[in-house]
Amino acid sequence: MVEISDDIQVLSHELHSSKLEYLGAIRGIRSWCKEFGERQKMEIDFKDDVSRLVPLEIGLCLFRILQEALHNAIKHSGVKRIEVEIAEHGNEVHLEIKDSGRGFDLEAVKRGSGLGLTSMRERARLVGGTLTLESKPMQGTSIHVRVPLKAKAGASAA
């Protein structure tokens, strides 16, 4: 029972975005990655190269995609190290998440009914961005998100 309570508390904390509001998008995401890595006993190699302020709605979009991707990696990849990079490229911000785990057959996932990939793509689309995925069995997975630094009007990725 205590374990369930702890899990609910962690989930509630993860769903709350006040850390992004308080620290700013990039620092908030970095802080969350550190905490998540410690909780999951895995190394998250976080790098960022963003000089501009990332609007909260874009930061929240990237944060939610990252959460889903890291939870999927924990569940399916079998790795203890994941690379996360957020970088500014012109008028876009890019998020890349890479692991060297089990990987999977993309066609099989497209035919499946899982909501994770669909929700990540939809979040990116809502702020005018795109999400691409590369994976092959036994060769790891790479997720690349590109979002314009100016979000679409009225967008919400929460």
Give residue ranges: language-model regions:
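Coiled-coil dimerization/phosphotransfer module
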Residues: 1-158
